[in-house]
Amino acid sequence: MNILITGGSGFIGSHFIEEIIKREDVTKIYNVDAGTYAANKNLPFQTDKKYQKLTMDIAAPYFPDCKKYFESLNLDYVIHFAAESHVDNSIKGPKKFIETNIIGTFNLLEIFRETNIKKFIHVSTDEVFGTLNHKEGPFDIDSPYRPNSPYAASKASSDLLVRSYVKTYQFPGIITNCSNNFGPRQFPEKLIPVCINKLIKKEPIPLYGNGANVRDWIYVKDHVNALINVLLDGKVGKQYLIGGDKEVSNYDLIFLIKDIYSKLTGINIDWEWYKHVEDRKGHDFKYAINTCDFKMEFPQFELSQFEEKLEETIKSYI
């Protein structure tokens, strides 16, 4: 298999490469990555003979002109991770999100719609579905798109572009929507590494609003394993919801992180270790994903134990 991965130096993309490159049936991995601020610089697979880094920006004006080059690679699969993903940044400056997440996805679709790739997997988010209240059940495959942040809107737009190419051009697209990922190598702007780094520095963890907002968490390697299942056996044209079946309020999460950190380090946390801050604009209250359909189609897929993987993650930062 020859596989092209966009955003393979990022958090989820790098974990995907780390796993997929171990397979004997993988011949070549091409990583198209712009090397943005969130890219990991030292990756465990970067000296592997199967691996090749292509420093490119999928949203750049030159990128569509690379079509013949990509055709020459004889690719079997494309997995599209590359995205601007930090909600707070999208509120401060949405333009980059429109460029990378929408224009970048469009450029990829145009490059590959007349090639012989077997599958184009577009990795997206559960935030496209908007928010749930405390009484509502999880999102499912029939949930309408109701994005509430510029980030979520840009990902919803890219999802719909992929869907339109599947219907219009018989493009071999698949869409996956995942819940919040966590694990080693995550850029420190995200909630869990923010908490860990604040504890290390003995600074208060900023908690939006009253901390009641709920997120569903999935360990990054579990997400990767789900995506490998989709790559190998997923059906073209389908949309898959991938979650961790672990809904936790932000308030409960920071206390859990604090307790694990204290246990691992032996440090008695006796300072003011968290503080309430002004809530995020348009802060979605709750995300949750119904994973029943995915588990029925892929019964071999298993989820890790949340607290165990959270402890492993904290260890990787300290």
Located regions from the model:
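C-terminal substrate-binding subdomain of Rossmann-fold SDR/epimerase-dehydratase oxidoreductases
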Residues: 35, 56, 107, 199-318
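A conserved pocket-lining segment of Rossmann-fold NAD(P)-dependent short-chain dehydrogenase/reductase
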Residues: 90, 142-144, 173-184, 195-218, ...
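The catalytic Tyr-centered alpha-helix of NAD(P)H-dependent dehydrogenases
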Residues: 147-154, 184, 188-192, 216-220
